[in-house]
Amino acid sequence: MNEWMAAARNPTAEWLESCFGVGSLWRPAEAELPERLEHEGTREFLTTVGFPAVRIDGFLDFIDFDSSRLKTEGPWAEDPDELFGQRTPDDDSPPRSYAFEFGKCQEFSLMVDGVVGCVDLYDPNGWDHAAGYAGEAHSSLKALSGALGLAAQFAQRFEGPEPLKALAEFRTAIEDLDPLVESDLWEKVTEALEEEFEPAEEIGQDS
């Protein structure tokens, strides 16, 4: 557990590939990055470590995460004011900044703020009535990468005899990994898992 946390706090390409497979990372050259992705920490992480460009399934299908398009298309860019309902319909001024999609989780898009580097959730179902903002995910793309790696490490324990215990430890690990953010992303994921695990564990105890 301590080794997992140390690796998740400072994820390397080697560790992430041990979680998701050799060749699974999108590691663009500096010139390949979007110009409006201005946050230096994000740019450095992408060009030196890389971000998982994967479709997560199997043990991790509970996350329903897909970032596979990064390698072929790069991150989708959009005006965050437009996404999150902060722009009036008659405002045709140029975007002040951009946010970049680095994957989808369930029905939400994970949007990295191009200026400050934080990761927010965008709900496309709320776009047309100023309800696109669905909460915080992580303080940085680096932290999101570490959290995805942790999920990969915990996955087999969720299939074991004590999934609720594993889930509680996973929640604590996510909180310790990114203490500045109460992640709405993992709250949604873990609440759904808890609903699934509780009856399954009760059946196991009764048998």
Residue ranges and their predicted role:
Residues 1-109, 180, 186-207:
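A surface-exposed partner-binding patch
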